[in-house]
A protein has these predicted regions:
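Bergerat-fold GHKL ATPase/HATPase_c domain
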Residues: 1-17, 68-69
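Conserved ATP-binding N-box helix of the HATPase_c
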Residues: 10-31
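A conserved short beta-strand within the histidine kinase catalytic ATPase domain
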Residues: 33-38
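GHKL-type ATPase core
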Residues: 43-61, 66, 77-206
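Conserved activation segment of eukaryotic-like protein kinases, specifically the C-terminal portion
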Residues: 72-76
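Short beta-strand elements
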Residues: 230-240
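Conserved small/polar residues in nucleotide/adenosyl-binding loops
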Residues: 245-250
């Protein structure tokens, strides 16, 4: 609960957000243009991106591959190292390892430097060393598939509508990134694509779509000072809604400081 909020549907969906947030970080760093989130018929979820691929080299301090550190050690995410991500949306390097620990099993497949690598974990434990399984050509990216642990979660059925709302927000907040949500569960098959070049300016248009705007043009500005980047879009309407996001996760305007 400390990391994902609950062991119900909210926490279950959060597992997907955490893996997807790592892909968003790749986009914010300029290396990922598409994320595919798939709800599989067997209860697993798959998150695939076309980023650089999680590093596979051996870490000098631990003696294990960087990808294994990401999935088995807290605070081992790429955003902590030198040259890490300038902006990040996840749990600051703990997200992937938490998802792994809360899953019956998790498999990661990486395309990097022309080669494909795979590794499997069960309840957080490494099943075999990272292995090279083939070639990728020019393709790069990371694919993660996991099965939430029924011994931990009270609910193991993903809520498509909640995921759709969050992934839509994620796409609005990371302009240019395409996110495709696919439901392959029997009797629930559907797909939705989110891709917004207008970013949060387009998000305001979406939020105001059924409201009466008090003026036609959206107020927009962006800037950076002392290493803090700020982007603002607003358009007053005849009701009251205040939404606040930081990097690019939602926050409660009443409690955020």
């Amino acid at each position: 609960g400390m990391y994902i909020g609950s062991v119900g549907t909210k926490g279950l969906n959060h597992l997907i957000y955490e893996i997807a947030d790592n892909s968003v970080d790749e986009h914010l760093a300029g290396f990922c243009t598409q994320i595919n989130v798939t709800l599989n018929d067997d209860g697993t979820a798959t998150i695939k991106d076309n980023g650089r691929g999680i590093p596979t080299g051996i870490n000098n301090k631990t003696g294990i591959p960087a990808v294994e550190m990401v999935f088995t050690m807290l605070h081992a995410g790429g955003k902590f190292g030198t040259g890490g991500y300038k902006i990040s949306g996840g749990l600051h390097g703990v997200g992937a390892s938490v998802v792994n620990a809360l899953s019956e099993w998790l498999e990661v497949s990486i395309c990097r430097d022309g080669k494909r690598y795979e590794q499997r974990y069960e309840r957080g434990k490494t099943m075999y060393p990272l292995k090279e399984v083939g070639e990728c050509g020019d393709s790069t990216g990371t694919t993660v598939t996991f099965l939430p642990d029924k011994q931990i979660f009270e609910e193991t059925v993903y809520d498509y509508d909640i995921l759709k709302q969050r992934l839509r927000e994620m796409a609005f907040l990371t302009k240019g990134l395409k996110i495709i949500l696919t439901d392959k569960r029997e009797g629930m098959e559907r797909e939705k694509t989110f891709h917004y070049e207008g970013g949060i300016r387009e998000f305001v248009t979406y939020l105001n779509r059924s409201k009466e705007a008090l003026y036609p043009e959206i107020i927009y500005c962006e800037g950076e000072k002392d290493g803090v980047a700020v982007e603002v879009a607003m358009q007053h309407n005849d009701s009251y809604t205040c939404l606040l996001y930081t990097s690019p996760s939602p926050r409660d305007p009443k409690t955020s400081r």
